[in-house]
Amino acid sequence: MSTISAALVMQLRERTGAGMMECKKFLIATNGDIEQAIIEMRKAGQAKADKKADRVAAEGIIVIARSSDERTAVMLEINSETDFVARDENFTNFANAVADAALTNLPKNIEDLSNQALSSGTTVEQARQELVAKIGENIKLRRLERMHCDGVIGYYLHGSRIGVMVALKNGSEALAKDIAMHVAASKPMVVSRDQVPAEAIENEREIFTAQAKESGKPQEIIDKMIDGRINKFIDEVSLLGQPYVKDPNIKVGQLLKEKNAEVISFVRYEVGEGIEKKEDNFVEEVMAQVRT
């Protein structure tokens, strides 16, 4: 077996980002053939990624990339198992590279995105597997949203946990960004009143009806109470009916009217929403170890 020099180990480390001992192990296994070592490391990375694929990844970041003409943008949620890894430079660099690839190629879905090439030459999926092997956690590309409009797209990132894109007609990028910030804070369900799902209204009506009947008031009064609460609910969940976060004295709809602008659509992502996290019970874990 040939002697593995420190310089060769460093060369492999610079090319792969793997640890020193990991690089030395693969160089020994391939008799110092650095190209073969990289191949074997990728194979091992895929095996590690496959083993970690079932582990829940509910932390992570939201990333957004937008074209220079501000008319096309993409937003991604990329998950890790822990918040610690979500802040890791290797993870954030990967996420931003994937967002750039998504903006360049505009894939239809995550599966399509996984097959796209990064600027480094590897595919998104290959890079994901290598990152899993390097950091030891499951990494998941959870969801992707593409947006295009003839007006302007504004976006807002609250840290890296909440992301919003807003398509605006006849308005400035600054206004679109302000609306995106409002959406991040106020979490509207739809743009306008007429878009509120009938099912959501009916569910609220049932709740309000049950509450109003307990008041003991005449049915005529109860009906007016219910109608008033329904109208309030619709305003609360529709963007145009919400008080504007920067000036609660006016509603978003009024602001847009004054600016002669129109929100075409918006998308809001929040890290981990809808993912069921496993709750660790450390007492049970310790007791289980004591019993063994």
Curated annotation (Swiss-Prot):
Keywords: Cytoplasm, Elongation factor, Protein biosynthesis. Signal peptide: none annotated. Gene3D superfamilies: 1.10.286.20, DNA helicase RuvA subunit, C-terminal domain (1.10.8.10), Elongation factor Ts, dimerisation domain (3.30.479.20). Residues 82-85 are annotated as: Involved in Mg(2+) ion dislocation from EF-Tu. GO terms for cellular component: cytoplasm. Transmembrane segments: none annotated. It is found in: Cytoplasm. Its main location: cytoplasm. It holds the Pfam family EF_TS. One of its GO terms (molecular function) is translation elongation factor activity. NCBIfam families: tsf (TIGR00116). Associates with the EF-Tu.GDP complex and induces the exchange of GDP to GTP. It remains bound to the aminoacyl-tRNA.EF-Tu.GTP complex up to the GTP hydrolysis stage on the ribosome. Belongs to the EF-Ts family. This is Elongation factor Ts. It comes from Legionella pneumophila (strain Paris). The gene is tsf.
